[in-house]
Amino acid sequence: MSGVQLSSLSTLNYRNLAPGTLHFPAGVTGVFGENGAGKTNLLEAAYLALTGLTDVTRLEQLIQSGEREAYVRADVQQGGSLSIQEVGLGRGRRHLKVDGVRAKTGDLPRGSAVWIRPEDSELVFGPPAGRRAYLDALLSRLSARYGQQLARYERTVAQRNAALKAGEDWAMHVWDDALVKLGTDIMLFRRRALTRLDELAREANAQLGSRKPLTLTLSESTTPETYAHDLAARRAEELSRGATVTGPHRDDLILTLGELPASEYASRGEGRTVALALRCAELELLAEKFGEKPVLLIDDFTAELDPGRRGFLLDLAASVPQAIVTGTERAPGAALTLRAHAGRFTEESRPATVGVGA
């Protein structure tokens, strides 16, 4: 299967990265250096430029101290054509362009990158909100309609919560009708998508050497069949709390390892393996949907992993058309190796046809 390729990445005033352009070959690019050298920021910038997505709470966090704006640009080969994707950051907003034309996040290729990082363990051990966010982000990339319905649902929940806080019991039937329609769509889409996601995650978990089978299920606070009834039944509680307590915004993605919930009983190593399995499933699901392998971004390939699982990650990187792998050690077998230091990247080795500037 062919894949998306990040031909080059340019940054200006982005975190601690020095301004400049990096050119990437097909295959594996290894980036090594001490912690704080800019390796993670490089992957974050690449992911932002490829997808338009970031999980920071304030965009100002991405802009270098003392600067008002930042900029990232990716030259992307996909589907046999080259596109230029630009993201400008400033005044609390993102400004996207594709080939010089203003765009929205949904206009960028939705299956262009997958980012594996040590923090993924929080998908296993963290609160339900993190697992919901993972699932919703993935499904929004698989289906633009899902993302649109989710945004409408979240706006409706916020408006209903405002009415609950104001004690507007008389208005609840209006909000309830909208909530049931949107929430039912979300629940049904999640159920359909989870069937394949569960299969792929189970396969990846086994390939990673886990002896305990992994199962993904949804813990739902209501069902499409009972949603309207459940909202009415908890009306008094919701008016008292000033919040909507029933619906897909309260659901959880349950990760079961063997017969026990991984969030409570998995070891740190097992949790890291489960998180890797989720990202591998994400990679395959996006490839199945869009017909091309995403660019694979792997942050700190040695973190919390034994040699066998490190080997799996490196084999995974070698199996896709393009990957960028960071670590405190050199990634073996890389087509291009870059040393990171203070936000700058210098070539250790590269194919003769590839130029990299920093």
Curated annotation (Swiss-Prot):
Q: Which GO terms describe its biological process?
A: DNA replication; DNA synthesis involved in DNA repair; double-strand break repair; SOS response
Q: Which GO terms describe its cellular component?
A: cytoplasm
GO molecular function terms listed in the Swiss-Prot or TrEMBL record: ATP binding; single-stranded DNA binding
User: Which Gene3D superfamilies does the annotation name?
Assistant: P-loop containing nucleotide triphosphate hydrolases, RecF/RecN/SMC, N-terminal domain
What keywords is this UniProt entry annotated with? ATP-binding, Cytoplasm, DNA damage, DNA repair, DNA replication, DNA-binding, Nucleotide-binding, SOS response
Quote the subcellular location field of this record.
Answer: Cytoplasm
PROSITE patterns recorded for this chain?
A: RECF_1, RECF_2
In the UniProt record, the signal sequence range is none
By its UniProt entry, which Pfam families does this protein fall under? Answer: SMC_N
Which positions in this protein are listed as binding ATP? G33, E34, N35, G36, A37, G38, K39, T40
What task does this protein carry out?
The RecF protein is involved in DNA metabolism; it is required for DNA replication and normal SOS inducibility. RecF binds preferentially to single-stranded, linear DNA. It also seems to bind ATP.
Which PANTHER family does the annotation name?
DNA REPLICATION AND REPAIR PROTEIN RECF
Q: Which family does it belong to?
A: Belongs to the RecF family.
Give the protein name, as stated in the record: DNA replication and repair protein RecF
Q: Which gene encodes it?
A: recF
